[in-house]
């Protein structure tokens, strides 16, 4: 929603919007740090949940601050003052950077907690449940935004926009913070202080950050999967910062209508996650499911262009459901592979590395999505916006093809052999010390 508001209502350059939003993902290296910290240091006998709570408090607070910063940046752009523009653009980028740190603090320990509490057989279904709930949240959020912004149709007064959006964001932050707290209290087994401290001390001695990094570099399969995750996520989200603007400029959709694109995408994703988690992935395997999901995503991107040629909102909504279905199948299998390509002793660190790949690609997607749209407008030199948006979708389809090529080179058995051998060497070296 915010990207649509900034690009279409406040007339921000698309590259500026994509660049500012990308700062959230540019803080992705913090994921590795928070993963390592949660592996080694407990708070009150708990390894994961305290970091989840701290991160949630941070990103909820920053979300409420985003609205005044966005509108202050808009005022600065309108004023034409170089000093004012520079200051507020830096403030906007800094806010999203801090938001990224808070998200890293909450999300990496959370996924590590999933690994702590499940085994390899349980994880595909657990991943399916997690992403189903995430998708339900996207659907509910899209509907709530659509209802809350219904009064903003044809509104051009920034003061009215800001007031409505601020009230909505305050309520969202309160609800999200409460849900996270209620969902995580008591889920992690608490250890006695002596046991926790003793175990923490052993962890610190067993595997340091330097040794963890050496282990991560020990298998070529880790690099292959890292690059696959980067391309898969980029291929899935490159259109994300421009999709609502696509609905606005090509299909003439109002704000409340374009926000519903996420709801239709979410419904498809929910169906895809359920199909993949309960039937497709267990039956055909994770690699085959991931490959199928990638091909379906590629087809969906081409259908987005076809929908633009028809100019039919109904066709666009059908394509969004198909796109979501493709994303659900691909995401379930990719995340199941991600959790398999992790060793229990360093769950937080490995999840941090995989999260780094995803976050880097989300950052690239936000910058490239806006930048490619601006480039497409320049190259097309036309008043027809479809050509510029189609340029982005074609590039995105090419990225998905690269992800498929990388997936064909992935070997999970080789990963286990490489990392288990390296882990044994590290532990034996520490015992000798």
What residue spans do the PLM features occupy?
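Short amphipathic helix-loop junctions that connect adjacent transmembrane helices
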Residues: 2-16, 241-258
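Loop-to-transmembrane helix entry/capping segments in MFS-fold secondary transporters
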Residues: 14-15, 89-90, 120-129, 255-256, ...
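Helix-to-loop junctions at the C-terminal end of transmembrane segments
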Residues: 29-46, 272-288
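C-terminal ends and interior cores of transmembrane alpha-helices
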Residues: 53-85, 295-311
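Intracellular loop-helix junctions on the cytosolic face of multi-pass helical membrane proteins
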Residues: 83-97, 105-106, 110-111, 117-230, ...
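Intracellular juxtamembrane helix-capping segments at the cytosolic ends
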Residues: 105-118, 329-343
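C-terminal transmembrane helical hairpin of 12-TM major facilitator-type secondary transporters
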Residues: 290-334
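A late C-terminal transmembrane helix in Major Facilitator Superfamily
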Residues: 346-377
């Amino acid at each position: 929603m915010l990207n649509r508001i900034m690009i279409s209502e406040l007339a921000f350059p698309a590259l500026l919007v994509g660049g500012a939003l990308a700062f959230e993902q540019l803080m992705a290296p913090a994921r590795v740090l928070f993963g390592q910290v949660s592996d080694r240091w407990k708070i009150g006998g708990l390894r994961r949940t305290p970091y989840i709570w701290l991160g949630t408090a941070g990103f909820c607070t920053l979300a409420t601050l985003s609205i005044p910063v966005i509108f202050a940046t808009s005022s600065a752009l309108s004023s034409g003052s170089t000093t004012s523009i520079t200051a507020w653009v830096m403030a906007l980028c800094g806010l999203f950077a801090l938001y990224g740190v808070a998200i890293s603090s909450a999300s990496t320990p959370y996924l590590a907690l999933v690994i702590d509490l499940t085994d390899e057989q349980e994880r595909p279904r657990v991943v399916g449940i997690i992403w189903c709930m995430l998708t339900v949240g996207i659907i509910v959020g899209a509907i709530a935004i659509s209802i809350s912004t219904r009064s903003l149709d044809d509104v051009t007064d920034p003061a009215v926009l800001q007031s409505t959006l601020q009230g909505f964001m305050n309520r969202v932050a309160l609800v999200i913070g409460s849900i996270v707290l209620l969902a995580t209290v008591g889920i992690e087994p608490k250890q006695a202080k002596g046991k926790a401290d003793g175990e923490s001390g052993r962890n610190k001695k067993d595997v340091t950050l330097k040794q963890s990094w050496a282990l991560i570099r020990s298998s070529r399969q880790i690099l292959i999967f890292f690059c696959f995750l980067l391309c898969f996520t980029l291929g899935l989200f490159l259109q994300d910062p421009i999709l609502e603007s696509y609905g606005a400029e090509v299909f003439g959709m109002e704000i409340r209508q374009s926000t519903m694109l996420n709801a239709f995408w979410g419904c498809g994703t929910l169906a895809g996650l359920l199909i993949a988690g309960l039937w497709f992935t267990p039956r055909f395997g994770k690699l085959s499911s991931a490959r199928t999901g990638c091909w379906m995503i590629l087809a969906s991107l081409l259908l987005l262009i076809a929908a633009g040629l028809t100019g039919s909102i109904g066709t666009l909504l059908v394509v969004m459901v198909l796109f979501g279905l493709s994303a659900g199948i691909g995401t379930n299998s990719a995340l199941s592979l991600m959790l398999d390509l992790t060793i229990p002793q360093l769950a937080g660190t490995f999840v941090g590395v995989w999260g780094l790949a995803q976050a880097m690609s989300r950052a690239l997607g936000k910058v490239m999505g806006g930048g490619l749209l601006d480039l497409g407008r320049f190259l097309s030199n036309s008043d027809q916006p479809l050509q510029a948006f189609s340029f982005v979708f074609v590039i995105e389809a090419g990225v998905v093809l690269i992800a498929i090529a990388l997936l064909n080179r992935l070997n999970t058995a080789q990963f286990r052999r490489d990392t288990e051998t390296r882990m044994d060497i590290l532990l034996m070296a520490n015992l000798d010390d």
